[in-house]
Amino acid sequence: MKKEEMAITVKDLHVYYRDMNRFSLKKGGLKARGTGKIFKAVKGVSFEVPKGQILGICGKNGSGKRTLLRAISGIFSPDSGSINLHGNSISLLSIGVGFQKQLTGYENIFLSGMLLGYSKEQIEAKIDDIIEFSELGDFIYRPVRSYSSGMHSKLAFSITAILETDIMLIDEVLSVGDIHFKEKSYNKMKELISNDDRTVVIVSHNSNTIKELCNKVIWLHEGLIKDQGDPNIIMDKYEAFMRNEG
């Protein structure tokens, strides 16, 4: 039997933060005092994602979902453990990540595309499609700092959806925006993940999204994998857990 090709391999991953909650005012600005308390956001997580699979990640706030996703994307460096990616390009679709807020939406399309490895000519060939899908109109020529979270989400999703990558990391963006755009982006997402060569990791609180789109789900709790497996089974367990927590 042919061995399954892996797109993402995470081994014994640890990611820590230092809580610098004590500051002093010195010349040049705020300076942190003391060592601060170390917060262990991800603690010894290991898993593999086969090429073409859609993995869901669930867990309550503070469970380490976002930290894990940003570590996979390369934004955060592991304190220990390893992350191996087997793809030509990777994109992180997350609110508040990846845009230069002083630049316009139009300029950020080029910046994002170049960071994904696209040439200026390749981006120019697709920029009209990106702008049209985003529905931002003339706002595309305004600085991103003036955008609402919904507008930011529309632009981020449109760039990632039109400038397709081998590995897509999606952080809750399908829950932001007006009802029309949510439906349109959800349908586009289903179209994108229908490609057997594309690997997707989705962080979501929405059980229906994970059940419908994902082949497998990992349930994170306090930085550890609490459970993993079939989305229908795991999400039912997770929902019951959250009801008891409430």
Model-identified regions with their sequence ranges:
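The feature captures the beta-strand-to-loop junction immediately N-terminal to the Walker
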Residues: 58-60
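H-loop/switch region of ABC-family ATPase nucleotide-binding domains
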Residues: 204-205
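Conserved ABC ATPase "signature" region
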Residues: 28-29, 110, 122-139
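A short, surface-exposed alpha-helical micro-motif characterized by mixed small hydrophobic
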Residues: 210-212
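Pre-NBD coupling/linker segments of ABC/ABC-like ATPases
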Residues: 1-41, 232-245
